[in-house]
From Swiss-Prot:
Any Gene Ontology biological process: cell surface receptor signaling pathway
Subcellular location: Cell membrane
Name of protein: T cell receptor beta variable 10-3
Keyword Mitochondrion applies: no
Entry GO CC: plasma membrane; T cell receptor complex
Role noted for this protein: V region of the variable domain of T cell receptor (TR) beta chain that participates in the antigen recognition. Alpha-beta T cell receptors are antigen specific receptors which are essential to the immune response and are present on the cell surface of T lymphocytes. Recognize peptide-major histocompatibility (MH) (pMH) complexes that are displayed by antigen presenting cells (APC), a prerequisite for efficient T cell adaptive immunity against pathogens.
Keywords: Adaptive immunity, Cell membrane, Disulfide bond, Immunity, Immunoglobulin domain, Membrane, Receptor, Signal, T cell receptor
Binding partners and assembly: Alpha-beta TR is a heterodimer composed of an alpha and beta chain; disulfide-linked. The alpha-beta TR is associated with the transmembrane signaling CD3 coreceptor proteins to form the TR-CD3 (TcR or TCR). The assembly of alpha-beta TR heterodimers with CD3 occurs in the endoplasmic reticulum where a single alpha-beta TR heterodimer associates with one CD3D-CD3E heterodimer, one CD3G-CD3E heterodimer and one CD247 homodimer forming a stable octameric structure. CD3D-CD3E and CD3G-CD3E heterodimers preferentially associate with TR alpha and TR beta chains, respectively.
Residue ranges of domain Ig-like in the record: 22-114
Domain of life where this protein originates: Eukaryota
Organism: Homo sapiens
Amino acid sequence: MGTRLFFYVALCLLWTGHMDAGITQSPRHKVTETGTPVTLRCHQTENHRYMYWYRQDPGHGLRLIHYSYGVKDTDKGEVSDGYSVSRSKTEDFLLTLESATSSQTSVYFCAISE
């Protein structure tokens, strides 16, 4: 059996105003074997154009992995190696760890903005 990784997917509420941010991430927690692909889903109900995936590691602030500025329009962030994204509809932005490695053990955050 291969090494297992623990991915903690946290909900990032980068929103001012009311408490319902209109954004969810799934799964909330993920344990997987190294070498296995893992997909994290960010779902929004606010119809915002911009969506972001970040990771936070001990001793570091948030680091941008990928972002999207519309359906099928995505770009890389500062730590994009080993990740891919897709956004086939406004509501969902998927982050895939192509082949999970121990260096990808992190807290993952999704955010949205207009």
